[in-house]
């Protein structure tokens, strides 16, 4: 067998890493827009904002599917799994994340949430993907350490016990979502799966906002513009994330996704003129090292040497 034959496989996985990095960047854009929305005197409730954001993302992806004449429905045999991911995926994860924010600082909640790559590693192993190889473990440790440094630097850490529970529940649900997408969605196009995930999240958050008495539409054009922009960025992020999962699997997707807090910090520096500390630069370097390593690492196979 020629030594050059694996090259297309490596190219596919490199592209997968780039797609996940692009998803992290777009989610960073969403964070910055969300910060700007929260700075107004009477901001739209978070639940309502997220419902509209995910609804816009679903409409954008549906329009893309129609324009490219791709199927709106998932592949046969994957529809039930996609429905479960759509209903219990981003919507439920976001619900617990923002419940946690009511009981702790954003830095503390984000730090706990970014435990999810470890949960992904455990879930992937339980799902039969095997233990990650040494290179992936190194990437995981580097990315998580970097994310922790970025989040903690210059920010207060305070959270109540119930907030810890909510944050870890959010991380666990998101980890299950990533692994479930890796296991279930083999033949469904990324545009299709992203559309239904957005629609499910939008519906779930809409119901929650109504029940909590926190539903309202944006009050002016500025809010509408920001939320629509968030929805468009979310649509692109969903597409890139699904393509990334398909190419590099759930665990390495989780590792590369640690770029998100770094992207948010750098965008805040560019757009909001926030200060970039030495801790952010150090953490960012570790995240980049972990992301690049994860993109280059191969999936664990029976032929690969496993961690003893």
What is each of the regions a protein language model found here?
Residues 2-51, 156-183, 204, 306-308:
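Glycine-/small-residue-enriched transmembrane alpha-helix faces in small-molecule transporters
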Residues 11-17, 42-51, 74-80, 152-173, ...:
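Juxtamembrane helix-entry segments on the extracytoplasmic side of multipass membrane proteins
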Residues 24-25, 51-52, 90, 94, ...:
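Helix-helix packing/entry segments at the starts of transmembrane helices
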Residues 34, 42-92, 119-120, 172-180, ...:
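Transmembrane alpha-helices of multi-pass small-molecule transport proteins
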Residues 37, 49, 53, 100, ...:
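Hydrophobic/aromatic residues within transmembrane alpha-helices
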């Amino acid at each position: 067998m020629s030594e050059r034959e694996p090259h297309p496989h490596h190219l596919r996985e490199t592209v997968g890493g780039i797609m996940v990095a692009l998803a992290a960047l777009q989610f960073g854009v969403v964070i910055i827009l969300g910060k700007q929305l929260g700075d107004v005197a009477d901001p739209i409730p978070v639940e309502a904002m997220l419902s509209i954001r995910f609804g816009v993302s679903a409409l954008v992806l549906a329009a893309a599917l129609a324009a490219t004449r791709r199927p709106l429905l998932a592949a046969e045999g994957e529809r039930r799994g996609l429905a479960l991911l759509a209903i219990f995926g981003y919507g439920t994860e976001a619900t617990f994340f923002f419940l946690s924010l009511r009981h702790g600082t954003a830095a503390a909640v984000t730090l706990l949430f970014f435990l999810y790559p470890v949960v992904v590693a455990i879930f992937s192993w339980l799902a039969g993907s095997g233990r990650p190889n040494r290179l992936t473990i190194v990437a995981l440790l580097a990315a998580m350490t970097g994310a922790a440094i970025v989040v903690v630097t210059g920010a207060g850490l305070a959270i109540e016990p119930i907030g810890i529970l909510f944050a870890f529940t959010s991380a666990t649900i998101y980890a299950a979502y990533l692994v479930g997408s890796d296991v279930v969605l083999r033949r469904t196009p990324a545009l299709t799966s992203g559309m239904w995930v957005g629609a499910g999240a939008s519906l779930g958050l809409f119901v929650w906002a109504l029940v909590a008495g926190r539903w309202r539409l944006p009050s002016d054009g500025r809010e509408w513009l920001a939320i629509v922009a968030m929805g468009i960025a979310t649509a692109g992020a969903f597409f890139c994330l699904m393509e990334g999962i398909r190419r590099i699997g759930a665990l390495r997707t989780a590792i590369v996704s640690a770029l998100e807090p770094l992207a948010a910090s750098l965008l805040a520096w560019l757009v909001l003129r926030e200060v970039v500390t030495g801790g952010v630069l150090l953490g960012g370097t570790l995240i980049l090292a972990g992301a690049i390593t994860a993109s280059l690492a191969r999936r664990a196979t029976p032929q690969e040497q496993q961690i003893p």
